[in-house]
A protein has these predicted regions:
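Feature captures the catalytic ectodomains and active-site-proximal regions of enzymes
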Residues: 1-208
Length: 208
């Protein structure tokens, strides 16, 4: 997507300074990937090796930050992997019906500036590739919805978090490929599923 739709990603590139190629873990199922992304350990260690959503019990970012006195919010879609595998942490959960409500809640939290970390999860593109194909009109519309949401979120950070240093991250959990049924899929150890891009933006504190 980065190579083929670079111009479409202009708002993301404008909001960040680093685009980093990442190889996600295998099997590239959503709960497996998020299990490793927020713990830093392999699936063998965090315990999720397929499309299942148990609560992860090993130490994670959602444990270490509260332990260090940081306040964390997780804003995500109901019944998603992110809404389930990191439950029972000392963080604030905002479980919303779908992406639009997630983004609006995240914007509200950014404006209040009461958290050290806000993790925001949207899922429309993944839903659309499974229902259709990776570059179908429906999937591409979802892709652009995610870009627009990130653009709004990062602009909100710039407007409301100028009193302290801030970082924004766009972090995909996996890629996807076309399966034998002509639908988008993932979960295999293949380049299209494993190779993704993460984008990092640093916003220094504005001094008087």
């Amino acid at each position: 997507m980065y190579q083929k739709y670079t111009e479409d990603l202009a708002p993301v590139l404008h909001a960040t300074q680093l685009a980093l190629p990442i190889a996600t873990v295998a099997p590239s199922w959503t709960p497996v990937c998020f299990g490793s992304m927020y713990t830093g350990v392999s699936p063998d260690v965090h315990g999720i090796k397929g499309y299942v959503k148990p609560v992860i019990t090993v130490d994670s970012l959602f444990d270490s930050l509260p332990r260090s006195g940081k306040k964390v919010a997780l804003v995500t879609v109901a019944k998603s992997s992110m809404a389930m595998v990191y439950l029972n942490r000392e963080i604030d959960y905002y479980i919303e019906e779908y992406d639009d409500a997630v983004t609006e809640k995240a914007l509200e939290l950014i404006q209040k500036d009461q958290y050290d970390l806000i993790v925001v999860y949207n899922q429309e593109y993944d839903d659309m590739i499974h229902r259709t194909q990776p570059e179908s009109p429906e999937a591409m519309a979802a892709f652009h919805h995610h870009i627009d949401a990130f653009d709004r979120l990062t602009k909100c950070v710039k407007a409301n978090w100028a009193d302290h240093d801030a970082m924004v991250v766009w972090a995909s959990d996996h890629g996807n490929h076309m399966n034998d049924q002509d639908h988008g899929a993932h979960g295999e150890d293949c380049p299209r599923d494993i190779n993704v891009m993460h984008y990092y933006g640093i916003y220094p504190k504005k001094h008087p």
